[in-house]
Design a protein with these regions (language model features):
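A beta-strand edge to alpha-helix "cap/lid" segment located at domain peripheries
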Residues: 27-57, 62-154
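Positively charged n-region of N-terminal signal peptides that target proteins for export
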Residues: 1-4
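Bacterial N-terminal signal peptides
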Residues: 9-21
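Secreted/extracellular small peptides and ectodomain modules produced from precursors
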Residues: 6, 16-17, 128, 146
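N-terminal membrane-insertion alpha helix
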Residues: 23-25
Length: 154
């Protein structure tokens, strides 16, 4: 009887510890998702202000962007576009942000971005759907890749 009680108690402790571990992991994933949502908004805010410093800090080495008018851009190209004073943002709204986490170092956000801007001498007013891949680089979340496809607009 005593042996059975010890085994039951040991089993209960193991199950309890597993539940605590699962709870901590789910909480951490929730925190990561919220952090990525905030960074996603900061990214768009910086883009609207042509703030290249934010991009320099938060774009990973090897970053690549696929934009909705069919061009690929490297990190350097993307930063040069932000520094281009002829690019003017009239409006921009990010919505429907969703984040999926893959362990503690990778996350993918997808969202809708509606904007009106003068970019590279061309007026663009459109709604795009985008996905960004984020990596945790030694404690700092950085975008490794972004891609947007046009839903409607010109």
């Amino acid at each position: 009887m005593k042996k059975t009680l010890i085994w039951c108690l040991a089993g209960f402790v193991i199950v309890a510890l597993c539940c605590v571990g699962l709870s901590v992991n789910l909480h951490a994933q929730g925190d990561t998702a919220q952090q990525i949502k905030e960074l996603q908004q900061q990214s768009r805010d910086a883009q609207m202000k042509n703030d290249a410093s934010w991009a320099q800090q938060h774009l990973a080495d090897g970053f690549v962007a696929g934009n909705s008018w069919g061009d690929w851009e490297t990190k350097d190209d993307f930063i040069k576009d932000l520094q281009n004073k002829t690019n003017k943002w009239k409006s921009g709204n990010i919505s429907e942000v969703q984040v999926a986490t893959f362990g503690s170092n990778i996350a993918v956000s997808h969202y809708t971005f509606t904007y009106d801007a003068e970019l590279r001498g061309t007026h663009r007013a459109r709604t795009v759907i985008c996905s960004d891949t984020w990596i945790n680089d030694s404690g700092t979340w950085k975008t490794a890749a972004t891609h947007c496809s046009m839903v409607k607009g010109k």
